[in-house]
Amino acid sequence: MVTTGTTADALRTIAFYLPQYHPIPENDQWWGPGYTEWNKVAAARPQFRGHRLPDVPGELGFYDLRLPEVREAQARLASTHGIDAFCYYHYWFQGKRLLQRPLAEVLASGEPRLPFLICWANEPWTRAWDGLSDEVLIEQTSGSSADWERHARALLELVADPRYLRVGGRPMILVYRAGRLSEPLGLT
């Protein structure tokens, strides 16, 4: 179990880990076959003088997060550069999960050994970054109390993992947009 609580453990460097770099059926439907965020990276064009785009990825290239060797290489690279943990984006839409495969495989395999936590990205998916912000692809609501319970139960496997980051013995879970919650969680 990874815990913090002493002065020596109080400061950690955590990198946000966006799981959008592998294809999923929903993105195939919404954006076209084989779509990942790499499509936008590769298509980026400079917007002003000196703007260097596309910004092609470094030594790992246009990686695919379905591959265990990619996730392990990312962890090695992160550790080499002083990253202590990954904070995986977690998507939950009233029981529907999206982009969960990389973290599910990390849990199942036990690799990489790098500590982790999650950030619940609790907002609807829209075409906002494509200039069509009013088109909702998948809605996000705070949900009923039954949905809260189902979500909490779904997180138990994550927070029970010995690599899961804790503060004062308690699992740390970030909420991307806490202001979007319709009622307080009652958590401490």
Tell me the role of every PLM-derived stretch.
Residues V2-T188:
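Glycan-processing catalytic domains of CAZymes
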